[in-house]
Amino acid sequence: MLPVFISYILSFQVKYIYKASDKYINNNIKTGIYIMRIDSQSIFLTNITYDDTADIVRWRNQKFVQENFIYQKNFTPEIHNKRMQTMVESGQVIQFIIWERKANKKIGSVYLRDIDYQNKKAEFGIFIGEKDYLGKGYGKIATRLIISYAFEKLNLNKIFLRLLTHNKRAFKCYLDCGFIQEGLFKQDVFIKNQPYDVVFMAILSNTPPA
């Protein structure tokens, strides 16, 4: 019988299930805890595995997903597998697949990257890869689940993110989830030889629930 921790955070039921097995990749290096699944009423999150490669590659190469990434080069299975080997398995990245509960369907991914346990911070990222599931609030729920996971279970103090200024839908979602804009970096990146401004947003662990 697996031990279960149930917490009511940000108005969502969040269930963390732990199992000490290397079958599940997202290993909290400091505690040796392996996270299998995080649940809410309408979606659930599971650890990313090599079996998700085809979905990740397909999602990342769709125009409506790719155009909102700062990194917009073609995404390949080789890039994904290298990321798994060098970043996910090392604990630098904790990444989940987002499932829509009713259809039991994979719809996207959410992750924390460059996790810095000393300074208690990490960078946040998310994308919905199935177009029919955009605009239904699933991204917002997944964002809130990861915020609560990062603060409650990883004991982080700050989650930050970067986004291109044209991504208005994501900007509103992040504001609704409690992020605040901390800066605007003018012409910070070049994509296809064109300069783009980048918004920097963050949320702290003592931020009141959104």
Language-model features: locations:
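N-terminal amphipathic/basic-hydrophobic helices that include classical n-h-c signal peptides
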Residues: 1-35
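A short, well-structured alpha-helix characteristic of acyl/acetyltransferase catalytic modules
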Residues: 25, 30-82, 207-210
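Acetyl-CoA-dependent GNAT
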Residues: 73-132, 204-206
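Glycine-rich acetyl-CoA-binding "A-motif" of GNAT/NAT acetyltransferases
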Residues: 104-108, 169, 195
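Conserved acetyl-CoA-binding loop-helix of GNAT-fold acetyltransferases
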Residues: 135-149, 171-176
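Short glycine/proline-centered loop/turn elements that form peptide/ligand docking sites
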Residues: 139, 143, 166-170, 187-192
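Conserved active-site tyrosine of GNAT-family acetyltransferases
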Residues: 174, 179, 201
